[in-house]
């Protein structure tokens, strides 16, 4: 099953809202420019309340539901409803668990002032601090909590973040890039104390086959592998 990366979903929404905004702004601007020429002064005296201001007043106040007004209200309603439906649809997609069963599950525990990452390997837990090694071209499900105060875990490039709350397990997912070698920063997005600005983790993307060779070899081999990878970036 093809999975849309989280960042692509947010960019798609951003471009949709931008396109609608540009279209609306262009339409309004064109109307104003048209009005400047259409209703410019002709040099002839007009009767009381017979000018453009009077016509606009009658359209907007005395006859707010004229034919044109109804049409504009209808079109505006369709556009707004379309944006609402698109936003809800994309947000619900992001909030679901990864749509495939073979996602790599990583436990993320926030603390003042760092991140603890846990892999389940062969029934045992392999732990790293502030450095996370993940395979390329893979869905990663983060199960996020905190052991002290409120935090929020997020990786800017993937346009996704989730609250880390003591006693509550939240989840979010990302799809790593196809090519290994990328390194991303993971930040805390919740003011959590004096060391908040220093609470930055590293997410290192490695070759998928190499990662799973170590992962499937047991906790000892995998722990040595991730520590060797991490040592290159410290």
UniProtKB/Swiss-Prot annotation:
It is a multi-pass membrane protein. SUPFAM superfamilies: Cupredoxins (SSF49503). The keyword Metal-binding applies. InterPro entries: CcO_II, CcO_II-like_C, Copper_CuA, Cupredoxin, Cyt_c_oxidase_su2. Keywords: Cell membrane, Copper, Electron transport, Membrane, Metal-binding, Oxidoreductase, Respiratory chain, Transmembrane, Transmembrane helix, Transport. Its EC number is 1.9.3.-. Pfam families: COX2. GO terms for molecular function: copper ion binding; cytochrome-c oxidase activity. It comes from the Archaea. Its main location: membrane. Belongs to the cytochrome c oxidase subunit 2 family. This is Heme-copper oxidase subunit 2. It comes from Aeropyrum pernix (strain ATCC 700893 / DSM 11879 / JCM 9820 / NBRC 100138 / K1).
